[in-house]
Amino acid sequence: MSYFKRNEGTIVFAFASIGFIAFYIINYYIRRCRNRAAAAGDIEEARMSPRRPPRGLDAEAIKSFPSFVYTEARGIEPGIGELECVVCLNEFKDDETLRLVPPCVHVFHADCVDIWLSHSSTCPICRAKVVP
């Protein structure tokens, strides 16, 4: 048996391995180029597209929602312990001004929900559409 016949399997394996590695490298390079081109296109598209108008509510509409002091409302609903504002995650304290969001009747710190509603027209908890 000649030397080449004995090592034929090794040679075939080596060429197959080299081919697989070359295929993997080329495939990786092509994907990377596509991702860069797509990212550059997204950036360019974002620059060219007109800016969206603000989606929140205006200040007058926000101020029209009912507001009250926490001390006044604390005794209205018996059985409810400490409540917290889901926007800032702080508990309500005596003498803080709260604001009620009309369609869903959720309550928040007035300052917190005013900022939220100036950017978004939905309730921070249930995402109900807030209409003044």
UniProtKB/Swiss-Prot annotation:
Q: Which GO biological process annotations does it have?
A: protein ubiquitination
Q: Its pathway?
A: Protein modification; protein ubiquitination
Q: Which Pfam families match?
A: zf-RING_2
The catalysed reaction is: S-ubiquitinyl-[E2 ubiquitin-conjugating enzyme]-L-cysteine + [acceptor protein]-L-lysine = [E2 ubiquitin-conjugating enzyme]-L-cysteine + N(6)-ubiquitinyl-[acceptor protein]-L-lysine
Zinc finger spans (RING-type)? Answer: 85-127
Q: Does the keyword Metal-binding apply?
A: yes
What Gene Ontology cellular component terms go with this record? Answer: membrane
What is the predominant subcellular site recorded for this chain? Answer: membrane
Its membrane topology is listed as:
Single-pass membrane protein
Q: Name one GO molecular function term.
A: zinc ion binding
Q: Which UniProt keywords apply?
A: Membrane, Metal-binding, Transferase, Transmembrane, Transmembrane helix, Ubl conjugation pathway, Zinc, Zinc-finger
- Where is this gene product found? Membrane
Top-level taxon of the source organism? Eukaryota
| Domain comment as written in the entry | The RING-type zinc finger domain mediates binding to an E2 ubiquitin-conjugating enzyme.
Family assignment? Belongs to the RING-type zinc finger family. ATL subfamily.
Name of this protein? RING-H2 finger protein ATL39
